[in-house]
A protein has these predicted regions:
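C-terminal beta-strand-loop-alpha-helix "lid" module of Rossmann-like NAD(P)-dependent dehydrogenases
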Residues: 1-290
């Protein structure tokens, strides 16, 4: 067999092996996407009821540290990315948006410090020598309520302790399997309108009697609200990651199939040419002996 045919056979085998890997990764990402979507849907009733309670308490005045706007000296910027790659432009989109925002908010008297969730954001900002306060690189796209609450509690504690006077979160909002959108919001300090607009009005609202008082109930609900916002930010980011990876690996699998078809066509043409040449040589030799 001519060397060109051997080389084409080797390339076809290599692409087929790669196609098997990308197909398997697509299936794994699809399974993770379904689980993440189920977790998001399951969390909505709790979030809706929490928002309804906060909306009912919107007119309550309370002196709470989460509402306190202090002189801004240090700002903590949380960036949520993935730990693994092969998910298209997912990580590039969120890290680029965060970096553009950081450059636009580079004030002489304000220190911007990064708190990254995901190995990809950690690597990106390390290469560019941005100050990283903490990096969490072991979540692996898993929606873990206990870990998410621990992150939220840490952010609240450090804000209350005046270590940072503002906390901004960069995440990716899940729109659909094929669509996701980088976004950011101020987590702390809370603004009264944030809690008023937390939920859209849905028909007649329920009237509640608060014990021991509306102020006490609001004070108890605010940390839960922050926890819920952190949960949504991380859960939507991870769901977007799985959707992006499934789409990316699906495209890679399709492209591998097209490449296999092209290489097979080249191989068949090369084999046909080799056979034709051999026949011509045999006929030529027979004619010479005749």
């Amino acid at each position: 067999m001519p060397a060109s045919l051997k080389e084409l056979d080797r390339r076809i085998r290599s692409v087929k092996n790669t196609q098997q890997i990308t197909r398997a990764m697509k299936m794994v990402a699809a399974a993770k996407l379904r689980r993440s979507q189920d977790r998001l849907v399951a969390a909505r009733p709790y979030a809706a009821k929490l928002d309804e309670l906060l909306q009912g308490l919107a007119g309550t005045s309370i002196d709470h540290p989460f509402f306190e706007e202090r002189e801004l000296r240090r700002r903590l910027v949380v960036v949520v990315s993935s730990d693994k790659g092969l998910c298209g432009s997912y990580n590039a989109n969120i890290t680029r948006e965060a970096e553009v925002w950081l450059k636009a908010h580079a004030e002489a008297d304000v220190e911007n410090v990064l708190y990254v969730v995901g190995r990809k954001a950690n690597d990106y900002f390390k290469r560019r020598q941005w100050p990283i306060d903490r990096a969490i690189t072991d979540l692996n796209g898993t929606i873990d309520l206990e870990r998410f609450n621990a992150i939220a509690d840490e952010l609240m504690h450090r804000f209350v302790e005046d270590e940072f006077q503002e906390v901004v979160v960069f995440t990716t909002r899940f729109v659909s399997t094929l669509s996701y959108q980088p976004t950011h919001f101020t987590l702390l300090p809370l603004k009264p309108e944030d809690e008023e607009d937390a939920a859209e009005p849905a028909g007649a609202s329920t009237e509640y009697i608060y014990e021991p008082s509306a102020e006490a109930v609001l004070a108890a609900l605010l940390p839960k609200s922050v926890r819920n916002r952190v949960f949504n930010a991380l859960a939507e980011a991870f769901t977007s990651e799985h959707g992006a990876r499934m789409t990316s690996m699906g495209s890679a699998t399709d492209n591998a199939g097209e490449l296999i078809d092209t290489l097979t066509l080249f191989r068949n043409r090369a084999r046909q040419a080799a056979i034709t040449q051999e026949i011509s040589e045999i006929v030529g030799g027979a004619n010479a002996l005749a």
